[in-house]
UniProtKB/Swiss-Prot annotation:
Organism placement in taxonomy: Bacteria, Pseudomonadati, Pseudomonadota, Gammaproteobacteria, Enterobacterales
Induction or repression: Expressed in late exponential phase (other phases not tested); part of a large cas-CRISPR3 polycistronic operon.
Stated name of the protein: CRISPR-associated protein Csy1
Keywords tagged on the record: Antiviral defense, Coiled coil
Sequence similarity: Belongs to the CRISPR-associated Csy1 family.
Organism: Pectobacterium atrosepticum (strain SCRI 1043 / ATCC BAA-672)
Amino acid sequence: MRNGLPEFILSYINNRKQAKLDAFDKEAEKKRATLSGEALSVAELELAKARREIEQKHEVRNWLTDAASRAGQISLVTHALKFTHSDAKGSSVFNAETVEDATTLSTATLAQPAIDAVGNAAALDVAKLLQTEHDGDSLVAALQRGDNRALEALAENPEQLAQWLTGFQQVFTNRQPSSHKLAKQIYFPLANGEYHLLSPLYSSSLAHALHQRISAVRFGDEAKAIRQAQRTNQWHDQLSISYPNLAVQNMGGTKPQNISALNSSRSGRSYLLSSAPPQWNSIEKPPQQHESIFRPRGEVDYHTRATLAQMQRFLLSVKDVENNRDIRQQRLHYLDQLIDQLFFYVASVQNLPVGWSAESELKRAQQLWLDPYRAETDTVFRREREAGDWQQAVAYEFGRWLNRRLKHENLIFGEVERREWSTAALFKRRMREMESALKEELA
């Protein structure tokens, strides 16, 4: 055993305890503020008791005993079923075997595949304890090779150690494999009319390796230094790597932990590489000569013209039909297309040479949006950008633009519709994602 695992376990449990106590103390203060007199005295006794219970629960041996008892609620896997469908109840698979000289990219080509954990989301704290690396080792790796010294150093007696080992080793138990009606299934034909029924599983380990590689290229310190050198026309001794036309698949919605532990660590984000054939794209020119990209026959008009025409035709076709769920969904579909086309254009403009907006006629909010890297050298610009007020102005301009572009003698759009466009969920989400990525780069 490498040095430090017992200390890591102690630190892990203590950090969880402190987080629980901090949250408890914060809520307790709120409760005290609403009480006085006898009611406050009674509440103080109850609060003191509840706080002691948290401390007792997080006493190291108590916590490890509880964690060992909950370990059976999770499984360590490389291929997880719930990526296929969050309600699927079948088996996930652990297969970390590697293949040398492979001709295709797969989990087997990973030298050290990340091990995922699936099962009861309430027990993922146990998975994190087992999986977290400390000084090049982890508790799960130690247990796999039969090295029990980390737990032995913390156990009160051999009986308690045996109880912990029995509990934690449940994560390695091979349960009876089963599929589920929500799993993907493929009929693979054989001779004589027979077939194999295959159930492909999503490789969480491969997805995590891809996420780590791409995140390092997009947000790593070295990648930031390379991009800074590019923007200032300086030499750099490393290659500039990019993955164009990336797509992001969000797994698990607002509860990524219900899919798996690694999925939760990625906030549900999985990157998809583009498999589309290359296309010739003209280099975008900075919109310097006008006050808005939302002007008539402007840049946004050009990039969204086909979708705008389709949306207007659809709205005219259902003008006399009573509003229903299908109409609302189709209208939202067109709106989402427009938003994606807008942000695709914005992303291309943001990658133009830094500072182009300083000589432009653009409204200030659009300068702040479209030329974000100017904040690296312009302090006033940076402060305005960090204030964030410009985002509301941009959303307002987008809503006004869409009202104007959909206008027709048989279609009436007003403030209600403008507000709907400006506050669209996808618009907010794309803005949030774009700003989050930029914040990492500008940090």
